[in-house]
Curated annotation (Swiss-Prot):
Modification(s) after translation: Phosphorylated with a circadian rhythmicity, probably by the double-time protein (dbt). Phosphorylation could be implicated in the stability of per monomer and in the formation of heterodimer per-tim.
Composition-biased stretches (Gly residues): 92-113, 224-243
Biased composition range(s): Low complexity: 69-91
Entry function: Essential for biological clock functions. Determines the period length of circadian and ultradian rhythms; an increase in PER dosage leads to shortened circadian rhythms and a decrease leads to lengthened circadian rhythms. Essential for the circadian rhythmicity of locomotor activity, eclosion behavior, and for the rhythmic component of the male courtship song that originates in the thoracic nervous system. The biological cycle depends on the rhythmic formation and nuclear localization of the TIM-PER complex. Light induces the degradation of TIM, which promotes elimination of PER.
InterPro entries: Period_circadian_regulator (IPR050760)
Protein name: Period circadian protein
Gene Ontology molecular functions: transcription cis-regulatory region binding; transcription corepressor binding
Superkingdom, taxonomy of origin: Eukaryota
Location of this chain's protein in the cell: Nucleus; Cytoplasm, Perinuclear region
Annotated gene: per
Listed Basic and acidic residues bias regions: 145-156
Length: 375
C-alpha cells in the first residue's frame, strides 16, 4: 500500500549481496583442512589474492570478475562493468569478501571484464547509479508483492467458486448449503419408492374396515384385469355376494390375489387413480423387488391363502370372511414394518392371540399361514 514505509536499499539488496558473496566462493576454512580439489586457475588465484595484502581492485581482477563490491548489484555489471571494479565508497565489501579500505573516487586500474574503456568515477555518477538501482529494486519489490497479492486473491476466488458450484444441480449455487448423501443412482432407484410411500400413506383416504374387505378385493381384481393381468376376472359378483357360495369365492380370491400381485410389477410404480390398499402394496412390492430380487418367485405366497388350506376348513362354516379377515390384517401387519407413519394412519389393528413375525417382509411360510388361518 502507499501508506507503508518502503524498505531501505540495504534491505532490498540483502539477498543479492548474499548471493554474490557465496558465488565468489569465499575462504571459510584454513588451508590445511581444505580437501584437495581440482579447481580452475582463476578460482585458486582468487583465494590467493584474498589471503594476500593486495588491493581490492587487484583482487577483483584476479578473481575473474566473479563479484562486485559496495552497494551495487549484479545488474550494474551489464552496463558499467568497469565502474563496479573500483566503486568502494568506504562502506561496502569487495568481491572476494575483504572489507574495502580504498577511497570512493579512485580511478579504474584497467579494464574489468572486457575491452570496454574505463569510465572515470565521480561522486555524482555513483549517487546517480545508487538512485537508479534503488528505483529498480523498489520496482522489483512492488512487482513481487503484487504477484503474491494477485495469487492470494485468485486462490480466494477459486475457493469461493468451488463452494458456490459444489451443490449438485444444473445451475450455479443450486442446493447450496444442503447436505445430500448418496449417489444419483441410489436416489433414483430405491429411495423414491420409500419417500413416495410415506406421501401416499399420508394423503390416502381412510382404509376400509374388515367387513368391507370383499369390496376392496373385488376392486383389486378389477384393477388387475384392467392392468393387463393374467388372472380371471369374472368373479366380481361372486366375491361381493357374501358367504352363500363360499368355495368359488375363495378360489376366485386366490386367483385375484395372483392377478394383483403379478400385475403390480406391470403397473407404473405409483398409479394416481388407485387409492385402495393395493397402491400401498404396489409400492411395498416395488421396494421389495428393488432391494431383494432373489426372492422374486416367493411373492405370491405373501398375499393369498392357498385353496387347499381353505378347503380343509370345516364345511359347515363359511370360510369366506376368514381368509379376507386374515389377509387384510396380514397386509396391515406388513405395512408398518416399512413405515411407522403408515401404521399410524390405518384404522385396522393387530388381532389378539396372533403372533406376527415383525421383520418378515417378503415371505410367509405356508405353515405360518395355515396356523393363522385356523385361528
Amino acid at each position: 500500500s502507499s501508506t507503508e514505509t518502503p524498505p531501505s536499499y540495504n534491505q532490498l539488496n540483502y539477498n543479492e549481496n548474499l548471493l554474490r558473496f557465496f558465488n565468489s566462493k569465499p575462504v571459510t576454512a584454513p588451508v590445511e583442512l581444505d580437501p584437495p580439489k581440482v579447481e580452475p586457475s582463476y578460482v585458486s588465484s582468487a583465494r590467493e589474492d584474498a589471503r594476500s595484502t593486495l588491493s581490492p581492485v587487484q583482487g577483483f581482477e584476479g578473481s575473474g570478475g566473479t563479484g562486485s563490491s559496495g552497494n551495487f548489484t549484479t545488474g550494474s555489471n551489464l552496463h558499467m562493468s568497469s565502474v563496479t571494479n573500483t566503486s568502494n565508497a568506504g562502506t561496502g565489501t569487495s568481491g572476494t569478501g575483504n572489507s574495502g579500505g580504498g577511497g570512493g573516487g579512485g580511478g579504474g586500474a584497467g579494464p574489468g571484464n572486457g575491452a570496454v574503456p574505463p569510465v572515470t568515477l565521480t561522486e555524482s555518477l555513483l549517487n546517480k547509479h545508487n538512485d537508479e538501482m534503488e528505483k529498480f529494486m523498489l520496482k522489483k519489490h512492488r512487482e513481487s508483492r503484487g504477484r503474491s497479492g494477485e495469487k492470494n486473491k485468485k486462490s480466494a476466488n477459486d475457493t469461493l467458486k468451488m463452494v458456490e458450484y459444489s451443490g449438485p444441480g444444473p445451475g450455479p449455487g443450486h442446493g447450496h448449503g444442503i447436505k445430500r448423501g448418496g449417489s444419483h443412482s441410489w436416489e433414483g432407484e430405491a429411495n423414491k419408492p420409500k419417500q413416495l410411500l410415506t406421501l401416499n400413506t399420508g394423503g390416502m383416504p381412510p382404509l376400509l374396515d374388515i367387513h368391507t374387505s370383499s369390496a376392496s378385493l373385488s376392486k383389486c381384481q378389477a384393477s388387475g384385469a384392467g392392468g393387463g393381468g393374467s388372472g380371471s376376472v369374472g368373479g366380481t359378483g361372486n366375491i361381493g355376494s357374501g358367504g352363500s357360495n363360499a368355495q368359488p369365492s375363495t378360489n376366485q380370491y386366490t386367483q385375484s390375489g395372483l392377478s394383483c400381485t403379478q400385475n403390480i410389477n406391470l403397473w407404473p410404480p405409483f398409479s394416481v387413480g388407485i387409492t385402495t390398499p393395493t397402491s400401498v402394496l404396489s409400492t411395498h412390492t416395488a421396494v421389495a423387488q428393488s432391494s431383494f430380487s432373489t426372492q422374486h418367485n416367493l411373492f405370491p405366497t405373501f398375499y393369498y391363502i392357498p385353496a387347499s388350506i381353505a378347503a380343509s376348513s370345516p364345511s359347515g362354516t363359511s370360510p369366506n370372511p376368514r381368509p379376507h379377515k386374515h389377509t387384510l390384517v396380514h397386509k396391515s401387519a406388513e405395512q408398518p414394518s416399512t413405515s411407522q407413519a403408515a401404521a399410524a394412519t390405518m384404522p385396522l389393528q393387530y388381532m389378539t392371540g396372533l403372533m406376527y413375525p415383525h421383520p418378515s417382509l417378503f415371505y410367509t411360510h405356508p405353515a405360518a399361514a395355515a396356523a393363522t388361518a385356523m385361528v
